[in-house]
UniProtKB/Swiss-Prot annotation:
EC number assigned by the record: 3.6.4.-
Name assigned to this protein: Holliday junction branch migration complex subunit RuvB
Subunit structure: Homohexamer. Forms an RuvA(8)-RuvB(12)-Holliday junction (HJ) complex. HJ DNA is sandwiched between 2 RuvA tetramers; dsDNA enters through RuvA and exits via RuvB. An RuvB hexamer assembles on each DNA strand where it exits the tetramer. Each RuvB hexamer is contacted by two RuvA subunits (via domain III) on 2 adjacent RuvB subunits; this complex drives branch migration. In the full resolvosome a probable DNA-RuvA(4)-RuvB(12)-RuvC(2) complex forms which resolves the HJ.
Gene Ontology biological process terms, A to Z: DNA recombination; DNA repair
Region Head domain (RuvB-H), residue ranges: 263-339
Binding-site list for ATP: 28-29, 70, 73-75, 136-138, 179, 189, 226
Function: The RuvA-RuvB-RuvC complex processes Holliday junction (HJ) DNA during genetic recombination and DNA repair, while the RuvA-RuvB complex plays an important role in the rescue of blocked DNA replication forks via replication fork reversal (RFR). RuvA specifically binds to HJ cruciform DNA, conferring on it an open structure. The RuvB hexamer acts as an ATP-dependent pump, pulling dsDNA into and through the RuvAB complex. RuvB forms 2 homohexamers on either side of HJ DNA bound by 1 or 2 RuvA tetramers; 4 subunits per hexamer contact DNA at a time.
Free-text comment about domains: Has 3 domains, the large (RuvB-L) and small ATPase (RuvB-S) domains and the C-terminal head (RuvB-H) domain. The head domain binds DNA, while the ATPase domains jointly bind ATP, ADP or are empty depending on the state of the subunit in the translocation cycle. During a single DNA translocation step the structure of each domain remains the same, but their relative positions change.
Catalytic activity: ATP + H2O = ADP + phosphate + H(+)
SUPFAM superfamilies per UniProt: P-loop containing nucleoside triphosphate hydrolases (SSF52540), Winged helix' DNA-binding domain (SSF46785)
Coiled-coil annotated spans: none
Gene symbol of the encoding locus: ruvB
Pfam family, one: AAA_lid_4
Molecular function GO labels: ATP binding; ATP hydrolysis activity; four-way junction DNA binding; four-way junction helicase activity
Length: 339
């Protein structure tokens, strides 16, 4: 196991945005639904909804996109705006601190434009209150003046589409959630879909992929395109320094092993979590508070970042009594259950 003083400040397989991710993602991001790999049910539905809105010359219904980090929520929002042939203005929940911040964005929208709010679950209550009439009636209620002289005025807004993105749909208030006419959940990608994504990204990055190279990267990418693209960049570095720049299965395996991403896509934190359950708590069940204390990690990080992939891949179970390591987890580490 990796000791505490060996732990890097950022995980290579962390699905949240790091360093150069945003610039690279923007450069290789698909622009149309036809180029969007995976999420077939979402692509099919959005294609119909977008075409219908265009035929009626109306604004698309407000859209909520939710799912784990790194699956393409921002990409999908930009594709929707592109397919509608309208402008998109982008912001995030934490940035909109005051009602005036949101009002400034809303009053600068043209008819049918898209306003994209990332991390929409982090909107402050005062900003959220302003959003309700804007979404429902295309009106902006603002207060003019202060104290006894303060008065409310209504401003008409052009019809627009709000796209909200969140990793925590359950954290949205019911009044906000109910105002979205379209709700889409993004799922983890399978290996074949990620292989296609890695191949496409390699083409844009001028990386020559040979047999098995893209698939080896995809297998360790935890079902997440952002992680796949990040691993591809590290494999490219390795191939250029230790080889001739070409990426095959052997090169990809060597590079990813060097950066501590194993065959299952685990890094030190995944192994630490599973081994804590198996070795310290006899396989579970163990409560979230105890598990967080045992591995020195925040509860939200365990629930939102570490656990979804482990559960989806069958290494971990959540039960009413706590977390349990599955037989597959024991098999991965070559261990036998103690009970």
């Amino acid at each position: 196991m990796i000791e505490a003083d060996q732990i890097p400040t950022q995980r290579l397989i962390e699905p949240e945005v790091q360093g150069e991710d945003e610039a690279v993602d923007r450069a290789i991001r698909p622009k149309t639904l036809a180029d969007y790999t995976g999420q077939k049910h979402v692509v099919e539905q959005m294609g119909i909804f977008i075409e219908a809105a265009r035929k009626r010359q109306e604004a698309l219904d407000h859209l909520l996109i939710f799912g784990p980090p790194g699956l393409g929520k921002t990409t999908l929002a930009n594709i929707v705006a592109n397919e509608l042939d309208v402008s998109i203005k982008t912001t995030s929940g934490p940035v909109l601190e005051k009602a005036g911040d949101l009002a400034a964005l809303l009053t600068n929208l043209e008819a049918h434009d898209v306003l994209f709010i990332d991390e929409i679950h982090r909107l402050s209550p005062v900003v959220e209150e302003i959003l309700y009439p804007a979404m429902e009636d295309y009106q902006l209620d603002i207060m003019i003046g202060e104290g006894p002289a303060a008065r409310s005025i209504k401003l008409d807004l052009p019809p627009f589409t709000l796209i909200g993105a969140t990793t925590r749909a359950g954290a949205l208030t019911s009044p906000l959630r109910d105002r979205f006419g379209i709700v889409q959940r993004l799922e983890f990608y399978d290996v074949n879909e990620l292989t296609d994504i890695v191949g496409r990204s390699a083409h844009f990055m001028n990386v020559r992929m040979l047999d098995g190279g893209a698939r080896e990267i995809a297998r360790r990418s935890r079902g997440t395109p952002r992680i796949a693209n990040r691993l591809l960049r590290r494999v490219r570095d390795y191939a250029e320094v230790r080889g001739n720049g070409d990426v095959d299965e052997v090169t990809a395996n060597a590079a990813l092993t060097m950066v501590d991403v194993d065959q299952a896509g685990f890094d030190y934190m995944d192994r630490k979590l599973l081994l804590a359950i198996m070795e310290k708590f006899m396989g579970g069940p163990v409560g979230l508070d105890n598990l967080a204390a045992a591995i020195g990690e925040e509860k939200d990080t365990i629930e939102d970042v570490l656990e979804p992939y482990l559960i989806q891949q069958g290494f971990l179970q959540r039960t009413p009594r706590g977390r349990i390591a599955t037989p597959r987890a024991y098999q991965h580490f070559g261990l036998k259950p103690e009970k």
